[in-house]
Amino acid sequence: MNVPAPLPPCSILLLAGGRGQRMGGRDKGLIEWQGAALIEHLHRLTRPLTDDLIISCNRNIDRYARYADRLVQDDDTDFNGPLAGIRAALPLARHRWLLILPCDVPLVDAALLRALREKASEYPERPIMVREGQHWQPLLGMIPVAHAATLEAAWQAGERSPRRALEPLQPVALQLEAGDPRLANLNTPCLLTGISENRNK
């Protein structure tokens, strides 16, 4: 019987610092789904995987603190997008890799996170990014913390897109089928309700 090789430790970043425009300005990570806040679903999944769990949040700091080892905030109040949270977390990560997840993907499972970490072990110098069909998902992946300075330089040059900021580093795809249900992005009230109804059938 083959025992899977142990995977190197990683820091984990949960992105919850957005404006929540599609949710009417509500703090998305704290919206309840299936009896718990979205951030709590991801906390349950990721807590056993790391001793360095980081949440990027820009409001409700006290509520998020219970779910993380550390919190990071953007350095201004303009809600500049997920790259702001990534650049804040990368220099602080305690491990070689930073695994990144947005707060609104509660159907992501342990098998997907393991696949990301296995791919990272194969390509230790390059970012790993989920690709669903032909579409990249730049907020689902892993970044070597050694690239913190590169992303910071992109930020200072005016780049705000995680995909474009990572492009020069030649991301490696973790290929998934189009429509993989684990990637359901519950970022509107209708999607939250629809997924809940489907799971309860």
From Swiss-Prot:
Q: Which InterPro entries match?
A: MobA-like_NTP_Trfase, Molybde_CF_guanTrfase, Nucleotide-diphossugar_trans
EC category: transferase
So where does Mg(2+) get bound? D104
Compartment(s)? Cytoplasm
* Enzyme Commission numbers on file: 2.7.7.77
Q: What is its main location?
A: cytoplasm
Q: Which GO terms describe its molecular function?
A: GTP binding; metal ion binding; molybdenum cofactor guanylyltransferase activity
Domain topic, free-text comment: The N-terminal domain determines nucleotide recognition and specific binding, while the C-terminal domain determines the specific binding to the target protein.
Q: What is the name of the protein in this document?
A: Molybdenum cofactor guanylyltransferase
Give the originating organism: Pseudomonas syringae pv. syringae (strain B728a)
